[in-house]
């Protein structure tokens, strides 16, 4: 691989060099969020050049509460470990890390308590919350409690898990983003209840206890968003299919000979 690629590092403020690279590339890939995309797009490409962009995205997690209620202690600990990998490894900053947790089923209250308490015990051994992050996290909680109109209740499981239970999902729910173990929650009976909120900013849906066939039917129901549906624990697994784009094909020139 080393012989096939060149890596160039320069200051991001160097617009002239960004302009030069844009003018000679066949394909420009911008991976850095919506703000970065807007900044770089001011530099034109060649007429036949193409572009792949990876903008800011929003992800969510779906849990079947009845299945969690029936889990034995070993399997529950394994589940929270996988959830930890999806969320806390990058402090919820990854585009595929969930911010919104959906609880499906009638036994959600008991399952919620069981899940979060088990995760809290795991975090005490694994996760170190910086002092500044702790302050910012609490400040965000205070702001949400005061300003959110769809706020129902809040709960803290130590200082490492903050949850805010919502009484409804607004169409701009993708603006509700947490860090360092800050999650928004909502209870549902079926997936049709969240169809109206899914826009093209939604990327990854992680799940546990829900039949794959049910999820396939849901995401194929003319949704504008959700490009990935993976089990809990696989949110950060990168592949050549990302953000709904087949990257390998997008970077390949096809010569048609008949």
Residue ranges of model-derived segments:
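Rossmann-like NAD(P) dinucleotide-binding subdomain of oxidoreductase/dehydrogenase enzymes
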Residues: 1-88
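Structural motif
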Residues: 29-31, 60-64, 100-102, 184, ...
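Glycine-rich beta-alpha junction loops
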Residues: 35, 55-60, 67, 100-107, ...
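Residues that line or immediately flank small-molecule/substrate-binding pockets and catalytic motifs
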Residues: 32, 209, 233
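NAD(P)-dependent aldehyde/semialdehyde dehydrogenase
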Residues: 81, 90-203, 213-257
């Amino acid at each position: 691989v080393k012989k096939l690629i060149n890596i160039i590092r320069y200051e991001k403020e160097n617009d002239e060099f960004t302009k030069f690279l844009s003018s000679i590339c066949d394909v420009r890939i911008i991976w850095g969020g919506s703000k970065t995309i807007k900044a770089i797009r001011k530099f034109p490409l060649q007429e036949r050049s193409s572009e792949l962009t990876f903008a800011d995205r929003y992800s969510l997690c779906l849990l079947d509460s009845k299945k969690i209620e029936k889990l034995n202690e070993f399997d529950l600990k394994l589940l929270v470990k996988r959830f930890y990998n999806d969320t806390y490894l990058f402090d919820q900053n990854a585009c595929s890390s969930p911010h919104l947790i959906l609880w499906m089923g009638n036994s959600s209250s008991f399952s919620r308590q069981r899940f979060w308490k088990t995760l809290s015990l795991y975090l005490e051994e694994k996760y170190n919350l910086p002092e500044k992050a702790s302050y910012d996290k609490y400040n965000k909680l205070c702001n949400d409690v005061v300003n959110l109109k769809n706020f129902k209740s809040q709960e803290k499981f130590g200082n490492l898990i903050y949850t805010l239970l919502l009484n409804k999902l607004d169409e701009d729910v993708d603006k509700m983003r947490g860090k360092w173990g800050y999650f928004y929650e909502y209870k549902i009976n079926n997936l049709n209840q969240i169809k109206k909120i899914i826009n093209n900013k939604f990327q990854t849906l992680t799940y546990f206890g829900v039949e794959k066939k049910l999820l396939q039917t849901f995401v194929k129901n003319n949704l504008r968003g959700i490009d990935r549906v993976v089990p809990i624990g696989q949110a950060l697994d990168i592949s050549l299919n990302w953000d709904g784009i087949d990257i390998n094909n997008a970077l390949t020139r096809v010569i048609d000979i008949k």
